[in-house]
């Protein structure tokens, strides 16, 4: 897991060091980038969710590993919602670009709640993780309800 976290950190650092417009040669590249980030986020949310919901035994280290990766990845997809990506076929609704302030506020809230989930996981306290996980899930649901096609 440490190799994965190191890789994600390297990618995140490179992504933050390069302006978003320079990162993507084509609008389709930006869409693939954000979809990939969201897929990874969903994977790590699923791992933590399985522990939170009792489908698998709670493993504090595994929860910490997943929330660490989740916290890093959550900061990445926002930059890939450039105006030139609106016409690329995806589940992103036009409301993202029509209500940019609302979308950005929701995205920023998600990133903040993921950071809180990561902090809760570092305590090793399952109840704290459950509470924070619910908050993250609420931000995901809100965005999916308002900005993602069914």
What would you call each of these model-derived segments?
Residues 8-15:
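Bacterial N-terminal signal peptides
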Residues 17-19:
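N-terminal signal peptide c-region/cleavage motif recognized by signal peptidases
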């Amino acid at each position: 897991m440490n190799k994965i976290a190191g890789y994600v950190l390297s990618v995140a650092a490179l992504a933050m060091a390069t302006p978003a417009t320079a990162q993507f040669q084509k609008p389709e590249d930006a869409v693939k980038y954000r979809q990939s980030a969201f897929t990874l986020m969903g994977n790590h949310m699923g791992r933590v969710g399985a522990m939170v919901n009792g489908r698998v035994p709670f493993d504090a280290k595994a929860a910490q590993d997943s929330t660490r990766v989740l916290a890093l990845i959550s900061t990445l997809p926002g930059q890939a919602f450039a105006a030139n990506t609106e016409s690329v076929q995806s589940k992103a609704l036009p409301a993202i670009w029509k209500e940019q302030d609302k979308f950005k506020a929701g995205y920023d809230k998600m990133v903040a709640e993921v950071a809180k989930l990561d902090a809760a996981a570092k305590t090793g306290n399952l109840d704290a993780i459950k509470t924070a996980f619910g908050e993250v899930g609420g931000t995901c649901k809100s965005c999916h309800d308002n900005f993602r096609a069914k």
